[in-house]
């Protein structure tokens, strides 16, 4: 898993990030390249809008999963079985063509003395989704963040998504779904735990 996981640093003011003005000018260049006139009425404000939208869409680069996962809770009444959150919706962008990836994540872990607030898992998905991604890398990144921060007995992550780079261009196969999984700890070493994870997913349909 280490080979695929990318460690994105939290950016600061010294990172060399272009300014808002430079980002807007880059959009104007793309508009001209596409054959458009960025000065026409309908496009005059587009560069600023695109730069603002991209700041939000790619806001995950400014966030660290470890900060979100830093606060945990003692297990309630000694609960130590699977904790599963399924159907967590997300959108991301393909790092190859910068077009959307739309999907949902299913995440489970086996507690080892501590549990996460339920919203924290969804926030971690959001952090990694709001970056340029491959689905394989995102799956591994989520699993690693939870595994290293919470140190549970095991983590299971499944992502299913439609890649618009495959639907809008190239082979143009709309509706095709890609599924990826990553398992750590007991989910990786104990096939029965993987079966339980998959059974719980199917049972909640």
Swiss-Prot record:
It comes from Sinorhizobium medicae (strain WSM419). The keyword Cell membrane does not apply. HAMAP family: FolE. Toroid-shaped homodecamer, composed of two pentamers of five dimers. InterPro entries: GTP-CH-I_C/QueF, GTP-CH-I_N, GTP_CycHdrlase_I, GTP_CycHdrlase_I_CS, GTP_CycHdrlase_I_dom. Pfam families: GTP_cyclohydroI. The lineage of its organism: Bacteria, Pseudomonadati, Pseudomonadota, Alphaproteobacteria, Hyphomicrobiales. SUPFAM superfamilies: Tetrahydrobiopterin biosynthesis enzymes-like. This is GTP cyclohydrolase 1.
């Amino acid at each position: 898993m280490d080979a695929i996981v990318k460690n994105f640093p939290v950016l600061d003011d010294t990172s060399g990030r272009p300014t808002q003005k430079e980002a807007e000018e880059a959009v104007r260049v793309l508009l001209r390249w596409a054959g458009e006139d960025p000065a026409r009425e309908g496009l005059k404000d587009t560069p600023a809008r695109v730069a603002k939208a991209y700041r939000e869409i790619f806001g995950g680069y400014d966030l660290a999963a470890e900060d979100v996962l830093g606060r945990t809770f003692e297990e309630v009444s000694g609960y130590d079985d699977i904790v599963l959150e399924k159907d967590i919706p997300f959108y991301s962008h393909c790092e190859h063509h910068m077009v959307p990836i739309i999907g949902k994540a299913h995440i489970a872990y086996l507690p080892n003395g501590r549990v996460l607030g339920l919203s924290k898992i969804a926030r971690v998905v959001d952090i990694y989704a709001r970056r340029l991604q491959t689905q394989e890398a995102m799956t591994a990144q989520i699993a690693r963040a939870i595994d290293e921060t919470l140190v549970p007995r095991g983590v299971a992550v499944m992502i299913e998504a439609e890649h618009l780079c495959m639907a809008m261009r190239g082979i143009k196969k709309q509706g095709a779904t890609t599924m990826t999984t990553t398992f750590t700890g007991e989910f990786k070493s104990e096939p029965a735990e993987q079966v339980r994870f998959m059974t719980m997913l199917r049972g909640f349909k």
